Amino acid sequence: YPLRRQRQMCIRDRATAAQYLKAGRMPGTLAHVRKVYAERAQAMGDALRKELGDAIEFVQPQGGLFVWARLTGAGGKVADGNVLAKRAIEKGVAFVPGTPFFCANPDHATFRLSFATADVDKIREGVARLGQAI
């Protein structure tokens, strides 16, 4: 009866969410989450500008959980997101190369960084390590 158990889980999850919403906690939670992610986004942008400088281009995110960036190859630095991903892993940092996000003709210089789960200190440390990988 795996399907019956799944249905019961969905009903319980919906009931829990409904109680949470009815209690009026959502506005406070959203305000807190927005503040946390805005701080993380700002920390990521500041760290990228400081550590990577003209080696990358990116737009400071105004929402969401990711920074979309493009390697410029400035100063003879790495210009391929797939190559950088391998080097970054050696430094203990992971990100997603941009090529899987293209339907056709991928830009190999692109990559996506997440600030969803790391606190500000970890973001700064991760970007510093990324700078070492470049």
Task: Walk through the language-model features, giving the residues of each.
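PLP-dependent enzyme catalytic core of the Aspartate aminotransferase-like
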Residues: E90-K91, A104-I134
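Residue-level recognition of strand-loop junctions within catalytic nucleotide-signaling folds
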Residues: K22, R70-T72, A116-A118
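Short, conserved charged micro-motifs
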Residues: G75-L84, D121-E125
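Single conserved hydrophobic/aromatic residue that forms the stacking wall/gate
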Residues: Y1-I11
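Structural motif of enzymes handling amino- and sulfur-group chemistry
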Residues: R12-V33
